[in-house]
Amino acid sequence: MSAVSALFIGNSFTQRNDVPALVARLAAARGHALHHALISAGGASLRMHLNKGEAQRTIERGGWDWVVLQEQSTLPIKNAKRFHENVRAFDAVIREHGARTALYLTWARRTAPESQRALTDAYRAIGAELGAAVVPAGIAWQRFLAEHDTPALHDADGSHPTLAGSYLAACCFLPVLFRENPLGIERSAPGLDDDAVARLQAAAAAAG
């Protein structure tokens, strides 16, 4: 058993359905413990978190193995340069205080699936530059949506995740934070049937 501490910084894409708690539930099923905290604000960009200062102060207090960064959902598409600047600023603080950076690669909106390529490229580029881990949630979403119609991953607004969408994202954290495969974890998603869980786990495993 291993214990990992992770600070999640983002917005409703992380807060909706409590993604950190879903990751912790999956980790527990593999015999690991995830101690987590979340700093979130609706629609927030990483720059907004930088300007507010709470996130940096929390990192500076120490005790984190990982800091997970989730950018505003369309900024990497519209302005990858600004996104990369935001990540660099956070990564410097994260490294200085002994933690590692994980980038939560998010998904395209339901009406603009073609934008996933730009999202993926933007996250991968800054991940490669900094040696940061990339959690490939958006890639897993893209793979799942290409093969399955149900369960729905997008909520009614076409942007935010359903429980299934958040669960799929959570599965993508296991290989990064714990070097564990999500395949075969049972009873890990109340509200989703076993067949749906198996399909979601398979998409996450394939994306890694």
List each model region and its residues.
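Conserved SGNH/GDSL esterase-like catalytic core that processes O-acyl groups on lipids
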Residues: V4-L7, F13-R88, V93-R95
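Short strand->helix junction
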Residues: S12-F13, R109
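Conserved catalytic region of serine esterases and O-acyltransferases that act on ester linkages
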Residues: H160, C171-G208
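Exposed alpha-helical structural elements
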Residues: D18, E54, A118, A122, ...
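Alpha-helical cap/lid subdomain in secreted, periplasmic
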Residues: Q56-Y167, C171-V176, E180-G184
